From Swiss-Prot:
Zn(2+) 2 binds at residues 185, 188, 211, 214. This is Chaperone protein DnaJ. Belongs to the DnaJ family. The gene is dnaJ. GO terms for biological process: chaperone cofactor-dependent protein refolding; DNA replication; protein refolding; response to heat. It comes from Chlorobium limicola (strain DSM 245 / NBRC 103803 / 6330). GO terms for cellular component: cytoplasm. Binds 2 Zn(2+) ions per monomer. The lineage of its organism: Bacteria, Pseudomonadati, Chlorobiota, Chlorobiia, Chlorobiales.
Length: 401
């Protein structure tokens, strides 16, 4: 019986693509034939891992697998002893493209490889390092958390944030060099790549990876800038304005393109990811776009009805309490909730009414309550219903006895 693909990768069925990719990378490195020569068990594990990743990394295949199991992907995923390698050249390309994506953009040329394509790892060109652009290396994304009050979330807000990040070095204008000059890298001789031959289960391979000296650029700076040590970037403080729309929820995030860390030596900047964190509120509890407020009223107010000022996210409003309002009743104040994230309009404020029970009563107050207790109107209606039900069954018993 074929193993469950999620179990093969050691992830849950709700795992994200990043979690699946991370698990695949770890296992592929662990069981790779280069690290386990002449180990048949490792070879089989390697096949299983690739087969599982081929399916779970593809949205359509994963959906069919979740719905129908192995039968749903039988035509595209490999099966039996052939493992991941019975699926043809297209499936190989998917698998090794993922290898290329995760292992730094490396590519390999095989000698005598039986798969019908030359560049198995699909690196292409001379771009060895992932994230490398025509000028420099792309900057990394920067993630920050932004705490907001419920009032700010209800209406939307613009925040000015002061953050620390990598910025372009002003001394060298981001080139990393005092003069802006560069020279060919001596490690890779300007190619941006280093090569290493190895034998695998597929035959002779030449692994081509990014040069560790120049980061895949092929050139290094001359006369390094002393302010940034030749990187073209340095730590700095910047001010960023963030416009948060109404209706965001805890965990939502906003992506500000190009506002992340600057890229070394002229590389494109990364993105700034602002993760929303909702502060707990002293008075209100959020329920989607509605807010809930607990209101304690005296027993006479519940019985007789009243008008009372109730706090909202937008200030106090007058709320009418109808006579004979029962505890735990929910009264609605339209349009006093949170603005809709997509579309116009706002949610409502729900007021949950509870009775306030005093703890300390005077002798006179106790006597008054005792007198009220004797009246029929203050008897719970459930007791009367019980008596009526008992009377009905007694009558039924009399009829059929």
């Amino acid at each position: 019986m074929k193993k469950d693909y999620y179990e093969v990768l050691g992830v849950s069925r709700s795992a994200s693509k990043d979690e699946i990719k991370k698990a695949y990378r770890k296992l592929a490195l662990q069981y790779h034939p280069d690290k386990n020569p002449d180990n048949k068990d490792a070879e089989e594990h390697f096949k299983e891992v690739n087969e599982a990743y081929e399916v779970l990394s593809n949205d359509d295949k994963r959906r069919r697998y979740d719905q129908f199991g192995h039968a749903g992907v039988g035509s595209s995923a490999a099966s039996g002893a052939g493992g991941a390698y019975a699926g043809g050249a297209t499936d190989f390309n998917d698998i090794f493209s993922a290898f290329n994506d995760m292992f730094g953009g490396g590519r390999a040329r095989g000698g005598g490889a039986p798969f019908g394509f030359e560049e198995v790892f699909g690196g292409g060109g001379g771009a060895g390092r992932r994230g490398r652009t025509s000028a420099g290396i792309s900057g990394t994304d920067l993630k920050i958390r932004l705490k907001l009050t419920l009032e700010e979330i209800a209406k939307g807000v613009e925040k000015t944030l002061k953050i620390k990040k990598q910025i372009v070095c002003k001394e060298c204008n981001g080139s990393g060099s005092k003069t802006g000059a560069t020279e060919p890298c001596q490690t890779c001789h300007g190619s941006g790549e280093v090569r290493q031959a190895s034998k695998t289960m597929f035959g002779q391979f030449v692994n081509i990876t990014a040069c560790p000296t120049c980061g895949g650029e092929g050139r290094v700076v001359k006369d390094r800038c002393t302010a940034c040590y030749g990187e073209g970037i340095k730590q700095g403080d910047v001010t960023v304005k963030v416009t948060v729309p109404a209706g965001v929820q805890d965990g939502n995030y906003l992506t500000l393109r190009g506002q992340g860390n600057a890229g070394p030596r002229g590389g494109a900047p990364g993105d700034l990811i602002v993760v929303i964190e909702e502060k707990p509120h002293e008075l209100f509890r959020r329920d989607g776009n509605d807010v809930i407020f607990n209101l304690a009223l005296s027993y006479p107010d519940l019985v007789l009805g009243t008008k009372i000022d109730v706090p909202t996210l937008d200030g106090a409003v007058k709320l009418t309490i109808p006579p004979a309002t029962q505890p735990e009743s929910m009264l609605r104040i339209p349009g006093q909730g949170i603005g809709h994230l997509r579309g116009s309009g706002k949610g409502d404020q729900l007021v949950r009414v509870n009775v306030y029970v005093p703890k300390d009563l005077s002798h006179h107050e106790k006597e008054l309550l005792k007198e009220l207790k004797k009246t029929a109107a203050f008897s719970p209606s459930g007791s009367n219903n019980d008596k009526e039900e008992k009377s009905f069954f007694e009558k039924a018993r009399d009829i059929f006895s």
